[in-house]
């Protein structure tokens, strides 16, 4: 089944009580198909200041927020005293419908991010990482997760990347350029995004699957008025190959 996800939320910028309510509501409405992922956010200090916090505390704030969210999902009348958040008798309704609570996946590809995933995460959803990097990182997470006594399911590893369909890769790359996220310059964009005919996307998906990824968040990189058409092509040419009845 398709999941209802969030890409990767910049958790230090969010109020965990409000976010717990929002995600639980999505899980309730989707009958248990909410798949949230969280991360530390960008390196831009202005984003943290705009949300009333500081980049300096983003790690501890993220770890504390995850703890608060899981408490609110699993209990009523939650009281909590932390460095960043304080709750007194707070209850969130509706509760998530997933029996074991929605899995919280972590983003990030740095060594500290992999360690954080292994320690606190239920899965890993990475962006801006080519398949070979994913293949190298998954065993690291699994090994560290054992050290933290944290069980991560084998199918809880995924990737986010952009796609744009066109007759040729060159045409697709030109169309996608203004809309594609580019946060690293050391890897060619075509190695971690899919621009061109549908087979370019299916070939990249196959490489990620071979690397150990099983869940994917695909971002159409195109003019807004073309988004529906791009998603329609995804449904017609790609989804049937991987979701056979």
Model-derived regions, located:
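Active-site-adjacent structural elements that line small-molecule/cofactor binding pockets in enzymes
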Residues: 1-245
């Amino acid at each position: 089944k398709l999941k209802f996800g969030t890409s990767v939320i910049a958790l230090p910028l969010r109020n965990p009580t409000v976010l717990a309510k929002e995600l639980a509501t999505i899980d309730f409405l989707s009958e248990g198909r909410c798949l949230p992922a969280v991360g530390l956010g960008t390196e831009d200090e202005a984003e943290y200041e705009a949300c009333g916090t500081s980049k300096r505390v983003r790690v501890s704030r993220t770890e504390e927020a995850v703890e608060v969210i899981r408490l609110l999902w699993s209990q009523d009348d939650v009281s909590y005293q932390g460095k960043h958040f304080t709750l007194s008798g707070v209850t969130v309704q509706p509760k998530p419908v997933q029996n074991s609570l929605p899995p919280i996946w972590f983003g990030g590809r740095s060594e500290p991010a992999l360690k954080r995933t292994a320690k606190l995460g239920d899965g890993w959803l990475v962006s801006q990482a080519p398949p070979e990097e994913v293949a190298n990182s998954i065993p690291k997470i699994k090994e560290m997760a054992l050290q933290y006594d944290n069980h991560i399911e084998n199918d809880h590893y995924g990737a986010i990347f952009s796609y744009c369909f066109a007759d040729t890769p060159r045409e697709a790359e030109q169309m996608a350029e203004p809309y594609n996220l580019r946060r690293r310059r050391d890897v060619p964009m075509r190695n971690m995004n899919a621009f061109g005919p549908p087979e370019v996307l299916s070939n990249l998906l196959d490489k990620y699957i071979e690397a150990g990824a099983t869940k994917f968040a695909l971002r159409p990189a195109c003019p807004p008025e073309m988004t529906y058409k791009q998603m329609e092509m995804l449904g017609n040419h790609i989804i049937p190959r991987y979701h056979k009845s």
